[in-house]
Amino acid sequence: GEAGTPFELMTQYPENKPAYSPRLMAAKLPIINVPTTPNSAVNRAGSGLKNPDLDHRMEYFDPKTRPHSVFLDEAVLLSSPPEVVRSTAATVFAGTLSSLSQTEQNPLVEGDHRQAFRLAHNAYLRLMNEIDNPALRIDLAMAAFLQNRAEDDGRRRFAGGPFSGNYAISTALHVRYP
């Protein structure tokens, strides 16, 4: 295990100073992610944990810990309860829909956004009637992955358009009311 309490290991936010990660220089093992739900963080570094005693997530961020590999396994994706999948699918679909409002995207970003929306839209419409269909969950997971990749490649997160303020609000609501 790591030395320190979760509060000592999470990203620190000292007053009037920049945030820093106490774990940044620690040795790292390769990370292999096998997600249970579609989420746009599967290929990102770090993680966030909800703590009911705090008004924000406990963040554990380290840019050196981007996953080495991501595996989408049907059985693992089917292990999530319908309520959880419905929630994450709604988040993925809303994110892909809002990305279509962005303008002046480079062709690679636009292609990822369009493919992510196509996958999410087709799967989302059928999901609750075919809750045990692994192909729909894989499509939603791929949509989330493509959406995240597009945001990384575009170097902006909902920087403009009618949905530009929704991300922060929806994240706060999702953390507060899971």
Q: What is each stretch, according to the model?
A:
Residues S99-P178:
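Active-site segments that bind and position negatively charged phosphate/pyrophosphate groups
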Residues G1:
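A phosphate-binding catalytic loop at a beta-strand-loop-alpha-helix junction
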Residues G4-L108:
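A glycine/threonine-rich phosphate-anchoring loop and its flanking beta-alpha core
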